[in-house]
Amino acid sequence: MKKSEFAKKAYENAEFLESNEARTLRILSEYLEPLKRLNEWKVNSTIFFLGSSKAKVEEKDSPLTRYYWEAEELSYNLAKWAIKLKQKGKNFVVCTGGGPGIMEAANRGAWRAEGKSMGMNISLPEDQYLNRYISPELSFIFNYFFMRKFWMLYKARAVVAFPGGYGTLDEIFETLTLVQTNKIS
């Protein structure tokens, strides 16, 4: 009996998994896979940094460059503090959206301190990449913004906001709404 090209296991059928009918499975995957990985790496608390993706180290005259270095330094100090806390059984990790600019600066500060840092990137039509300072085991790429924001805030014990654009404002207002409605504290 010849194996049919239609006889695929549903979970191995890429065409199905990318279809509208499988959207719920993709959403569930973006909940369960990060949960499993964060549990494996014992990440129970994060310090979430947000801010402009446009802040560049090379652009000395840009007003955002100052914030890049401030985010990097603050993240460095918080990561050093988190390393001391880890010895007491608490595992704080720096968390960002995983992209360039302020996100890179925060991941870079944690990397410089030899601490763990997490990046939660989003799949976009234009070039979007994970910055090189993220701990590889804590690198995530999401398809859905709402799942990305869920994980950015779910383990957050502190939120640090730097100047940014619409994405930063969206994340700030989402956080404030969740605090105001007692969904997070």
Show the residue positions of the predicted features.
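Glycine-rich beta-alpha loop segments
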Residues: 3, 8, 14-120, 128
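Conserved phosphate- and dinucleotide-binding cores of soluble alpha/beta proteins
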Residues: 125-185
